[in-house]
Regions:
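A polyanion-binding, active-site-adjacent surface
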Residues: 2-182, 195-200, 210-246
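Conserved flavin/dinucleotide-binding core of flavoenzymes
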Residues: 185
Length: 249
């Protein structure tokens, strides 16, 4: 319960964050200049907190909220095309109770899965600046500390993959320059004396501070509409996750 309460406090800190002036201005712009199809929406217009199961073994790291997806609805991947792919795959693999989410107040619930992002504000052209990524990094580092049962981290896209590796190094993991590639799975361990955010668990082989990182192409329209990422390819990612963590919690 302590971790759950700490996560709630962290979520409040994220929502109230104003570290990046460019992103604050951009959120105000998209809130005040809604496209016709969303004129009736009351935009969230603030940084988005992470969400999911505090006891999750699967941690998903995305890039950033979509301007007219999460920044509109108030929940990551809710109401956009990437979310349609992600929630469908999570539902099929047993991590979500429903295959689609359009609003933050629907009954979607994640089980054994937690979703976060490299940055928590929608950036212009979906391209965060290096300093904006650094401003947001402490939130991810704190999630690493609080999510004590994580066994596998799924990085959606190359930026999320690169920044996840950087963050793991900062909490004591010995990680070489690993190449990004769809479906590539890496096992990394903390260096001797490094701080481990995972608990010791004989079933999960966490006594050595090991965690697995799985990379995938991001389910963005740029990738899905061009065929770079197909439904079977994305489904196989979650089949691999199930093989790695098993069914039991």
């Amino acid at each position: 319960m302590r971790s759950e309460e700490a996560l709630k406090r962290l979520h409040k800190s994220v929502v109230s964050c104003r570290k990046c002036p460019r992103l604050v201005i951009y959120l105000e712009e998209i809130t005040n200049r809604k496209p016709k199809r969303y004129q009736q929406w009351d935009y969230w217009g603030k940084p988005l907190p992470s969400f999911g199961d505090p006891q999750a073994r699967l941690l998903i790291v995305g890039l950033a909220p979509a301007a007219h997806g999460g920044a509109r609805t108030g929940r990551m991947f809710t109401g956009d095309r990437s979310g349609e792919w992600l929630f469908s795959a999570l539902h099929e693999a047993g991590f979500s109770n429903r295959p689609k989410s359009d609003r933050r107040d629907d009954d979607l619930t994640l089980s054994d899965c937690y979703i976060t992002a490299t940055i928590h504000c929608a950036p212009p052209k979906n391209k965060p600046l290096p300093q904006e990524i650094e401003n947001c990094r402490p939130y991810l580092l704190e999630e690493f500390r609080l999510l004590k049962k994580v066994r596998i981290i799924l990085a959606l896209g190359q930026i999320a993959f690169t920044q996840t590796l950087r963050s793991l190094r900062l909490v004591g993991y010995e990680i070489p320059n690993l190449p990004f590639g769809h479906g590539r799975l890496y096992r990394v361990s903390r260096r001797e004396g490094g701080k481990d955010f995972l608990r010791s668990d004989r079933r999960a082989d966490l006594s050595t501070g090991a965690v697995k990182i799985l990379a995938t192409y991001h389910p963005s329209q740029q990738n899905t509409q061009t065929g770079r990422l197909t439904r079977p390819m994305f489904r196989q990612i979650f089949e691999k996750i199930r093989e790695e963590i098993g069914e039991e919690q």
